[in-house]
């Protein structure tokens, strides 16, 4: 059987009291396939269900969930890209969380809240509110302050360059994580070819 390392000593003590024969060993690479229990903090834990749809890391691999979670929020916001829709998602999910009627779905609701928040940020930068360009709206003091960070309609290249920079950063960051993972699995020599 398999036991999480944090309760290994308690399990050994319990088995010793029962006078049961057992051997406590560490799993061997390429021989054993121990089950995985991910240990992430609260924010990254919300994204585990998304990561699990692709693949769960092996016992020896690096868990990518905390690394892809911020990118997922940002790219979801890029795709939605509307301040109004993001605010609507935030309000609905927060109302459902506070109502405490859907406690079984709390993680999904918090995930929806953070995705909505990312959409609010990217919607502010793209300058749209339910499809209305905010650069055309006059007389709202808050908008006057935000117009400096919004993409200008005639400056489509600024949005392109920002997307390009973020994409290159994500690819390089992913390659660095792959090097760390390969070093952890096979040693630094195997990571050099990455």
Predicted ranges, named:
Residues 1-5:
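Short beta-strand-to-loop capping motifs
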Residues 9-194:
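Conserved, carboxylate-rich catalytic/transport cores that coordinate ions
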């Amino acid at each position: 059987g398999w036991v999480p390392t944090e309760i290994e000593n308690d399990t050994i003590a319990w088995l010793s009291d029962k006078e049961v024969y057992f051997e406590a060993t560490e799993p061997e690479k390429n021989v054993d396939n121990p089950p995985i229990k991910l240990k992430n903090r609260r924010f990254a834990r919300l994204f585990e269900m998304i990561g699990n749809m692709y693949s769960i890391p092996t016992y020896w691999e690096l868990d990518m969930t905390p690394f892809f979670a911020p990118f997922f929020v940002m790219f979801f916001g890029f795709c939605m890209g509307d301040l109004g829709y993001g605010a609507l998602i935030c309000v609905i999910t927060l109302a459902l969380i506070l109502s405490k009627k859907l406690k079984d779905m709390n993680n999904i609701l918090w995930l929806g809240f953070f995705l909505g928040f990312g959409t609010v940020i990217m919607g502010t930068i793209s300058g749209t509110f339910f499809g209305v360009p905010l650069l055309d709206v006059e007389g709202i003091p808050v908008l006057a302050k935000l117009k400096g960070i919004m993409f200008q309609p005639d400056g489509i290249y600024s949005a392109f360059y920002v997307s390009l920079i973020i994409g290159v950063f994500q690819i390089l960051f992913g390659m660095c994580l792959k090097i760390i993972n390969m070093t952890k699995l096979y040693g630094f020599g195997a990571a050099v070819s990455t």
